Amino acid sequence: MAKRVTIGDVAARAGVSTATVSRVLNGGVATEATATRVWDAVTRLEYTPNALTRGIFAGRSNALGVVIRDLSSPFYLGLLRGIDDVAAANDSLVMVANTFRNVDHEVDLVRMMDEHRVRGLVTTTDERTDSRTRHMAENGTPCVIVARTAQDPPSGLHSVSLDHVGAGRLMAMHLIECGRSSIGVVTSGGRPSQIERVAGLRQAFTQRGRSLAEEAVTVATTEEEVDRAVGTLLARADDRRRPLDALACTAGRLTVAVHTALTARGITIPDDIAFLTMDDFSWAPALGISVITQPSYQMGRRAAELVVDPPAEPVSIVFEPALVARRSCGERANV
């Protein structure tokens, strides 16, 4: 096995000390002749600097830490692309960890990111990790919470989120405009984004002189629970003698499961029931599924920019949702 070239080999080739090589590689002061000899030795020996050693001397690595709750959501793919593009442009490595929605694991992963002295942290974790994230920010590591707003953030703690109430309002207005009147909602639980989207749905219905009954909203925290949730909504509507003519899903990661639950029951979209969900994905156009989109790529870029060029004061950035109308709500029939 070939021996890895070391900084000592470069120093010997250039005829200088290892301290001089380190200084040149890190942009320190050196004469032009010395720098030329060092870089020539680096090139000829194909030397790769040790990022770990650099991090030790700098007191921080050059990696940008990202803690994701659930990579099954289409939202996170665009988010990661945006983060990676900014990191690459700033000579940073992206260190990604997926928590699988396990809060204890989330806390551990944020702690480990801190222990690895990442350049900064972008996190989509539960509120119960905020004390650890806040601790990192207070100790000089820029942190960005994505998908919700940080409460009373200290310097160094920022947030990038969506207008979730606006997303819910867009859902309600589109379904109403498509002539739907008996609407059920599948949401994924108590996350601020889910609560605010349902609140937006209610607001829009109220403004149109309608209401969204409590029993018209059901929670499914996992894909396995979705079939039961859809069945419950259909049964409740039938009991009220107002069969559902629309179903809204406020969590993009549950889209496939909700769509499957409807079609498995022989329900035709949109003839029997309109279907509207969050977050666009690769096969949505082929199936004609209408969606409320959030600009995940732009959100990822902005989050990473807050890490690589951190502002002095906390920043909270809110992006606007958009409707992509296809045909799953009966749009063509209403043209």
Each language-model region and where it sits:
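Central regulatory/effector-binding core of bacterial HTH transcription factors
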Residues: 85-130, 151
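N-terminal helix-turn-helix/winged-helix DNA-binding helices
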Residues: 1-6, 43-81, 89-90, 100-101, ...
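Short beta-strand scaffold positions
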Residues: 11, 123, 246-250
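Flexible loop/hinge segments that line or gate small-molecule binding clefts
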Residues: 101, 123-171, 253, 279-289
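Flexible loop/turn connectors
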Residues: 235-335
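Hinge/beta->alpha junction and helix N-cap segments in small-molecule ligand-binding domains
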Residues: 69-78, 96-105, 148, 159-170, ...
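Short beta-strand segments enriched in small/hydrophobic residues
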Residues: 18-22, 56-72, 174, 182-188
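N-terminal helix-turn-helix DNA-binding module of bacterial transcription factors
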Residues: 1-60, 333-334
